[in-house]
Every structure is written in structure tokens, then in C-alpha cells.
Amino acid sequence: PRRESVAVVVASPAAKVVVTVEVPMRPPVVRTPRVTDTSAQGLSLAPRFTAWVALGGNLGDVAATFRQALADIAALPGTHLQGVSALYETEPWQAQGPLFLNAVAAVSTVLAPGEFLRSLLAIEARLGRERPYPNAPRTLDLDLLAHGDAQSATPELTLPHPRAQERAFVLAPWAELSARLPDATLPPLPSREAIEALCQAQGARPGAPAGWEIARA
């Protein structure tokens, strides 16, 4: 470590004695950018990640709810949409009710996985999501499928999403969108043939309502 010299004067009855003592210098304080730094400079310096978000819903005007959710996601600090898949229609998963609409969005963000997930949950709540019982009909479901190459296994968040590979309504739009974003980071997906077979087995099919393509990012 760097050192500096400090002169210490010691008084004595006979004479003044000057003693030089070397003490370590404190290292300079280096502040790294934080995600909470929402200034243009702070956001530009923060590392960016591609987050993949699955959207689902079967209550109300689902396409309109999706559009609002995408706008809210894009409004998060240091976040913008990279692309959105077509809409897919799916039979309710392990439940009864109206057909689901599903899509997948790719998002570039500086937010860490946990912070990004909490933001998604807040958007769900603002747009009327309720959880009366498992697999209940819903206005909006936002699932974080992957966040860069992050891996997580906590009660709050598992990455990559542990059940995405089982769900045609996730895999079909995810594969479609990822083909348009070849440089984006994502986990390995099943083959096209395997996804098509899963779509047939689970009743997932393309079904974009009028106006959805106009709202596509």
C-alpha cells in the first residue's frame, strides 16, 4: 500500500525531537454504478441483460392488457423491448375457463433478476391479477423465463423457469421470437419438431386478434 510521511513533534524538557512516522494511506473510494442510479450516465454504464417474459391471460380484453403490460415493462428504468412474439391461443392449463392468449417478449434491461421479477409482479397487480386458487382464470400472468445466463434456485425465483420446457404455450412463441433475435442469450430450446408435437398435444395454436401486429415492438 502507498504510504505517506507524517512529522510528529515530541516535547521534552531538554529539546524538541522530531520523529517521522510512515502510515498507510487510505485507498481512494471507488463507487460503481448501481441500478438505483437512474441518471442517463448511471444507466448507460450498467451491464445489460436480455430477459425473456411470458405473457398469459384469459379474462377481459387480453390483447389490450398485454399492450399495457408491455408499455409498463418498457417504462422500467434502463429497460426497453427488443421484440414480441405473435399471440397464441391455448386451452386452459390444468384448469377450466376461457381460452388463454399467450405471447413471449424479449426485454433488454439493467435490472437484476430479483428486481425485474418484483417489477413484473407489481405490473400484474396493477392490471388486476388475482390469485384465488392455483391455475385460476386471470387478467394477466407475467413469468420470467430467463434473464441473461443467470441461474437461481430460491423460493422467490428459479432461473431458467423450471416448467417452461413442458409448456407449448411458452415454447412456441419463445422459439418464434428467438429466431428473430439470433444474438440474444437464452437457454437451449427443444427442436421445432418437438415443439410442434407439444403444441398438438396441448392445443396451442397461433391466434393473433386484430390490431396485435400493430402493437408489436
Regions found by a protein language model. Give the residues of each.
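Short alpha-helix boundary/capping segments
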Residues: P13-A15, A136
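Low-acidity, Ser/Thr- and Arg-rich intrinsically disordered low-complexity segments
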Residues: P1-S5, S12-P13
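Flexible, gly/pro- and Lys/Arg-enriched active-site loops
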Residues: T90-L101, L111-L117, L121-A217
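Basic polycationic patches enriched in arginine
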Residues: R2-R3, R26, R31-R34
